Amino acid sequence: MKAILIDSSASACSVCVTTDKVVTGHNYVSMDRGHASAIVPMIESTLKGAKTLFEELRFVAVTKGPGSFTGLRVSLAAAKAIALSNNIPLFGVSCFDAIASRVKNNRNLPVTDLLLIVIESKRKELYVECRDKSGTEIIESQALSISDIAGRFESLYQPGESVRIAGDAGGLIVEAIAEIIKPSGPAFTEDFSGVDAFDITTTKEYWALFNSTAKLGYTYQMDLNYLRKPDVSIPKIR
């Protein structure tokens, strides 16, 4: 079973192609803008490198946010075009889930009591979510300022708990979080990488897609998760 995974939710574009759960093609390019012009050539080159044709794909997965308004729509449009033209399912994966799964599956990193994920928004508020070691959300996904993130974290942090900060905006809150956990002794660990399409391969949603051997037709099972209102809206008709 072959699949293509796509992300352009933040300051990068990435594409991953898999065959029977094995990665056969992967491209990742950092970029602050130009996602719309980069994504299709990247998809084509990744498929070519993986020796995979569009008609061989069985499903498409794409990150569904939170992230850049434009970036999320760019990757969704590309993913939807592939799914529709090949009559295959389209699935969405949360950026928080992708990062959390990447961290969890990295055997070089020790397990921590808390995982604080912080994603860049290019605005004053950052996208944040915090999970305990069982994966339960203890700060639900939302957009908060650095001071509000620190306040919420301090209210739930228990002395002695180990912490990992992950996500491309993790570096922005290090100082505030360090002050909270410093009296307790243990240092936090870091994984300040943004989302990569490759991270989708570590999620439980991705692995669940292989449970069915039947060829499925086009389905659209996702909504983009922006976590905040757009900066520009259509004026109301008076």
Predicted regions and their residues:
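N-terminal beta-alpha supersecondary unit
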Residues: M1-K64
